[in-house]
């Protein structure tokens, strides 16, 4: 399906809609980045038609039929972005609301597909600064989502510089390594491993 889910906007339409809402101060906006764990195994065990159905069900449940949703967008096969209105809601209210939706949806998936454990990952960014570019705001929601990967005990994560620092540092190191490879600045040294019992070199460890 490639993210072309019935009822969802394209990338530019989504960004423009969110920008318009934020600039006019029409609603308080919270951005969502969402995907699910182990989606590949639904395709493998139950077939691609079932996988497509799960993706459309996510689109319907979290965005298209959600009364708080102002705009939504599908990316790739299993990535979603959305904007909810959070008028008269605290941050804690929004987190609780999303957590309840996750429990409902995960329970339904576990009943339909008992062979595959499913967890919904959600990152949130409260878009309270209209001067911030919408693409950067969406990236912050996505960064919050990525920071919870593998943490099945976290129903959703709100972006903050503190809780995303570790991921940012990892991303910076990865980018620096890629640049170093491209510029041929990588040197590899072999550190020998000595076998005391056999009194010989048993191997080596590569140091970059």
Give the location of each predicted region.
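Catalytic strand-loop-helix junctions within cyclic-nucleotide turnover domains
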Residues: 83-94, 110-115, 119-137, 162-166, ...
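Catalytic/regulatory signature loops of cyclic-dinucleotide turnover enzymes
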Residues: 136-161, 165, 175-187
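A structural signal for short, well-ordered beta-strand segments
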Residues: 31, 80, 120-124, 190, ...
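Conserved long alpha-helical elements within nucleotide-processing catalytic cores of c-di-GMP signaling
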Residues: 2-30, 37-63, 73-77, 81-82, ...
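Catalytic core regions of nucleotide second-messenger enzymes
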Residues: 72-76, 104-121, 149
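A conserved signal-transducing helical linker
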Residues: 2-8, 12, 49-52, 164-171, ...
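Active-site core of bacterial EAL-family cyclic-dinucleotide phosphodiesterase domains
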Residues: 166-208
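A short linear hydrophobic-aromatic micro-motif
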Residues: 68-71, 188-190
């Amino acid at each position: 399906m490639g993210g072309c889910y019935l009822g969802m906007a394209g990338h530019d339409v989504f960004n423009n809609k969110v920008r318009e809402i934020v600039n006019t101060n029409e609603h308080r906006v919270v951005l969502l980045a969402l995907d699910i764990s182990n989606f590949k195994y639904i395709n493998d065990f139950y077939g691609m038609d079932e996988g497509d159905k799960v993706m459309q069900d996510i689109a319907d449940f979290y965005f298209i039929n959600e009364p708080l949703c102002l705009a939504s967008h599908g990316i790739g096969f299993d990535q979603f972005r959305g904007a909810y209105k959070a008028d008269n809601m605290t941050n804690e209210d929004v987190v609780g609301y999303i957590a309840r939706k996750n429990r409902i949806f995960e329970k339904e998936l576990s009943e339909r597909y008992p062979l595959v454990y499913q967890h919904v990952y959600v990152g949130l960014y409260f878009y309270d600064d209209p001067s911030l570019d919408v693409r950067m705001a969406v990236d912050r929601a996505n960064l919050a989502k990525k920071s919870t990967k593998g943490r099945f005990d976290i129903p959703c994560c709100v972006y903050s510089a503190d809780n995303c620092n570790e991921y940012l540092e990892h991303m910076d190191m990865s980018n620096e390594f890629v640049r170093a490879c491209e510029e041929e600045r990588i040197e590899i040294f072999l550190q020998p491993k000595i076998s005391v019992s056999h009194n010989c070199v048993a191997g080596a460890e590569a140091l970059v």
